[in-house]
Amino acid sequence: MQTLNFPTYEFRFKSNENKRYIFDIIRKKFVVLTPEEWVRQHAVRFLLQDRGYPQSLMNVEKRIQINHLTKRYDIVIYRPDGSIFLVVECKAPQVGLTQEVFDQIARYNLTL
């Protein structure tokens, strides 16, 4: 996988049926290792290890309703009272930060 602009972290991997998997410590399971998942797992580790957010207040791929459509946040950090504190949208390294990407986050923000 591509080197990212994050500190170096130790990850658990496995391979099965010509697919590579990475262990997600939040979901507590192996997930298919895609370029976006690679970014998401680095962001999770950064938030936990380098920024000190508690794992108990973090959720990955949280589903939400936006205008009667189900969408997913990549990473959500909650306040102790259960309200959303931080939303992280991850993109594969080769995905550009276009207006469409900014619009996606803006739509998520409207539901908060």
Name these PLM-found stretches.
Residues 1-112:
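A short, conserved, highly charged catalytic patch centered on acidic carboxylates
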